[in-house]
């Protein structure tokens, strides 16, 4: 949580400072547009990393007094979350200051809001409780789990962040070169740098679901690929984890609890409800983002439940979904 907070602070407090410094750095002479961009980017990034040093020193001192801390893992998270965020914001600021000049501050403000909103939009619209973000790295989930962050997935995501940094630096250099005569070899070099970022970015984005950066409904359907349809439900499950003889019980239990909850709430509920049944805790944690919790998402009329938790949790989650009739419109919580 501390690393995520520092990543957000560097973006919001460091961004305007970076913008002011970027305007001054641009006036310095450079032998080529690309070298000038790399020099300016590293100056901004170095400042961002320096801003992160004092809080890191305080945390190191605190961890030395707490026995259950993992200092190496904490250092890795700090480098990957706010550290990489500083490199990303430095590239963003450099590009905006070159492309928009006087309006760069307003564009940066809007972009930071969009980057801040992205995880919330993703969590609200996709079947996941976590999100990865180029500014603050990752948000590990809206659940009661006390799980270690997936460092491997975060490392791969930060490779995607670096790819975007490379592309932004190449575009910035290209924009600067428009203001001065440039050789064909220089233009080819910039194109090569851009492709150096584009190719890995395209590969990583193509595999985003499989790598764990996100969990789209399309991807979830490939894992829970069998569907049992009843009068009021679309029940998705992994057929390898559900004996054929249990399907009738699962369908009947869903419909029985639906009728019972509807009568108890004295409502008419017309939406079809989607029930995602996970074969085990590991699969639920990897795809949805929680191991210990069963979750209802009333605004989407869906439930995420472990196959072994149907009898214990189905009614509880169904109440959340159907009681949305009494909640605020569009959210229902």
Segments (PLM) and residue ranges:
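Secretory targeting signals
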Residues: 42-104
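Central hydrophobic cores of alpha-helical transmembrane segments
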Residues: 104-118, 189-196
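Juxtacatalytic substrate-recognition/specificity segment
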Residues: 217-332
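Membrane-interface helix-boundary motifs at transmembrane edges
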Residues: 26-42, 97-105, 178-187
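Membrane-interfacial interhelical loops
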Residues: 1, 54-78, 113-159, 219
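Alpha-helical transmembrane segments
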Residues: 13-21, 91-95, 164-179
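Internal/C-terminal transmembrane anchor helices
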Residues: 180-210
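Long, hydrophobic alpha-helical segments
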Residues: 1-23
């Amino acid at each position: 949580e501390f690393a995520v907070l520092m990543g957000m602070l560097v973006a919001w407090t460091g961004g305007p400072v970076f913008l002011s410094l970027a305007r001054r750095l641009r006036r310095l002479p450079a032998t080529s547009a690309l070298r000038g961009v790399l020099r300016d980017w590293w100056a901004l990034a170095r400042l961002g990393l320096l801003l992160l040093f004092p809080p890191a020193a305080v945390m190191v001192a605190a961890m030395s007094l707490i026995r259950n801390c993992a200092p190496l893992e904490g250092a890795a998270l700090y480098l990957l979350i706010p550290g990489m965020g500083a490199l990303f914001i430095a590239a963003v600021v450099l590009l905006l200051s070159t492309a928009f000049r006087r309006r760069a501050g307003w564009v940066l403000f809007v972009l930071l809001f969009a980057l801040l909103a992205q995880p919330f939009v993703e969590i609200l619209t996709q079947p996941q409780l976590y999100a990865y973000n180029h500014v603050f790295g990752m948000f590990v989930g809206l659940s009661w789990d006390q799980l270690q962050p997936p460092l491997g997935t975060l490392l791969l995501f930060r490779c995607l962040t670096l790819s975007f940094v490379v592309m932004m630096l190449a575009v910035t250099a290209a924009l600067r070169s428009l203001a001065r005569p440039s050789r064909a070899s220089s233009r080819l070099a910039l194109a090569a740098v851009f492709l150096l970022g584009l190719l890995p970015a395209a590969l990583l984005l193509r595999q985003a679901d499989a790598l764990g950066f996100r969990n789209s409904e399309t991807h979830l359907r490939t894992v829970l690929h069998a569907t049992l349809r009843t009068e009021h439900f679309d029940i998705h499950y992994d057929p390898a984890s559900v004996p054929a003889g249990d399907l009738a019980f699962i369908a009947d239990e869903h419909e029985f609890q639906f009728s019972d909850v509807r009568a108890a709430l004295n409502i008419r509920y017309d939406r079809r409800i989607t029930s995602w049944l996970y074969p085990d805790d590991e699969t639920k944690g990897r795809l949805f983002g929680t191991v210990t919790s069963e979750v209802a998402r009333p605004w989407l009329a869906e439930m995420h439940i472990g196959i072994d938790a149907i009898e214990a949790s189905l009614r509880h989650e169904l109440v959340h979904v159907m009681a949305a009739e009494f909640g605020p419109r569009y959210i229902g919580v």
